[in-house]
Amino acid sequence: DAYFRISGKPAIVQVTTGPGAINALNGVFGAFVDSVPMIIISGQVRTDTISYIAAPGLRQMGDQEAPITHMVKSITKYSKIVMAPDELEETLKVSWFKAITGRPGPTWVDVPINIQGAQIDRSKNDEFVGNMNSDEFLEIKKPTDIDAALDIIVDAIGNSERPIIIAGNGIQFSQTVDELRQIGKQLNIPISTVWNAHDMIPNIHPSFCGRTGSDG
């Protein structure tokens, strides 16, 4: 979470199977509600000892096994367990682009230990690995429907008698803080910030009108 807020680039988190993955849930939930892109890669027991495959009805068969992809489904944009070596590249691609496109958020890739040690044809992965080092690959993708959203906002401001802007950390993530301040000043619209965006506008800025709390 902090890595993205400082660098603007998605963080990659590696955790072990079972307790390690479960202990990461609190941070992943925070990233989900705050729209922070993050790719979590967890270890998992061998594919042939995953309980719901090897012996349906068991709650655990492999050592420290946990059905983590099922557990994180509602707090990630994408989650998948890799069941074959040739699935790995495509799964990593999808998890990365899901994390940084549209509304950003965490994704989760679960990799059983026998898949971790499997042989993979590296020649098929060279292009993917090379692209991961490019600035374009790392850049957070802006929504494609932003013009339509702006039209709605402009109409709402025009039809409001006493408009106020409640600004959140999405403005920081999109690096449009200066534009927000200019809009507030030029249109004479007061600006309030939410709890996780307190540093977005100075208290002495002419448009600043205070911060929202848990009760308003």
Residue ranges and their predicted role:
Residues 1-216:
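N-terminal alpha/beta PP-like core and its mobile active-site loop of ThDP/TPP-dependent enzymes
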